Amino acid sequence: EVEWDCIVLDEYHYGAWGKNAKSYYDKKDPAHSRAAETEHILTEDAGSRKEIEAREIYDEGLMPLKTKAYLYLSGTPFRAISSGEFIEEQIYNWTYSDEQQAKEAWSSDEPNPYAQLPKMVMLTYQLPDSIREIAEQGEFDEFDLNEFFSAEDDTFEHEEYVQKWLDLIRGSYTENIVTELKLGTEKPPMPFSDSRFLSYLQHTYWFLPSVAACKAMARLLRKPVNRFFSDYEVIVAAGNEAGMGAKAVEPVYDAMGDPQKTKTITLSCGKLSTGVTIKPWTGILMLRNSSSPETYFQAAFRVQSPWTTRDEWGSEVILKPLCYVFDFAPNRALKQVQEYSCNLNVEETNPEKKVAKFIEFLPILAYDGSSM
């Protein structure tokens, strides 16, 4: 029996007992049976309570392979760190902030290895009362994205309000037009109306709460009233028919064709939100609740992958220097930023300094109604 020098578990936030990992284990081994017990509760939703519990079942002692050491890799290891699974000496951090800081500080004559990595910008929007009111719930009347985009079959329960939201993001919401005319160039930049975004956000990922919501959005985008979106190929990456893993990636690239000449919108409630790379994605719209920073930032960082090409002389051209996160629940967005920046940096003890370092490289623009 082979004793390996090291076993590397990538995407550790995602668990070690998924179907792909299990296929490498001896099916007669008790560990395989233990893994099978959790399979039925693994879902598309990377943040669901049951799925998190299933992933926590993993135990090195059950691994049917012998090794001298383990290396766990994750871009969002919040639960592993907060649970005390690893002591401080076992943790090495290289975060988004470190990467962007290294990119800016690069002074060598050698090519900058970080130059391709886009800088992320977050824009949060407090929706007008006339749109938000239908989904204000709870003790503090917080805007509930899951309620707002709730759907059955392929129809939104609040379709009238979702249509208002679509009008808003493309700059044609009538209740805002007079105010925006007064503001002129100071009006909030919406993802599908601001000229700075229109040519840049050719391919976006919309993160919705359910398969039904994805199908409902696809149907709504194809209505004559939304003729603006007819230029975009809409991909529903949700449900069993969308495929799993790499099979869910192929339809997206097929729809893009030559991504510099096409436009796409990918609708998903979990597929393609972790462990995959779709280079032409330049923006993500966060359209679902998420109390888990793992789920939130795994999805957000899907749009931060580098995208380059070669010019006629063979020189590298960076096509994506920036990428964007659009969030319509400002309080939730800021809470996620606070948790991400504070939980990953175990060396710094001052939370304000942790957040300050993070937003130095991830600027956040917050819009309330028609003002920043």
Segments predicted by a language model, with ranges:
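Conserved C-terminal RecA-like helicase domain
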Residues: 1-3, 23-24, 30, 142-268
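SF2 helicase catalytic motif II
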Residues: 2-65, 69
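A short beta-strand-to-loop transition that corresponds to the Sensor-1 phosphate-sensing loop
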Residues: 11, 73-77, 210, 268-271, ...
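Catalytic P-loop NTPase motifs of RecA-like helicase/translocase cores
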Residues: 15-18, 79-80, 293, 306
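Short mixed-charge
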Residues: 36-60, 105-108, 182-186, 228-233, ...
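Interdomain helical connector at the RecA1-RecA2 junction of SF1/SF2 helicase-like NTPases
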Residues: 61, 65, 69, 80-203
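Conserved RecA-like P-loop NTPase helicase motor core
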Residues: 229, 233-348
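Non-catalytic, charged low-complexity extensions flanking SF2 helicase motor domains
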Residues: 345-372
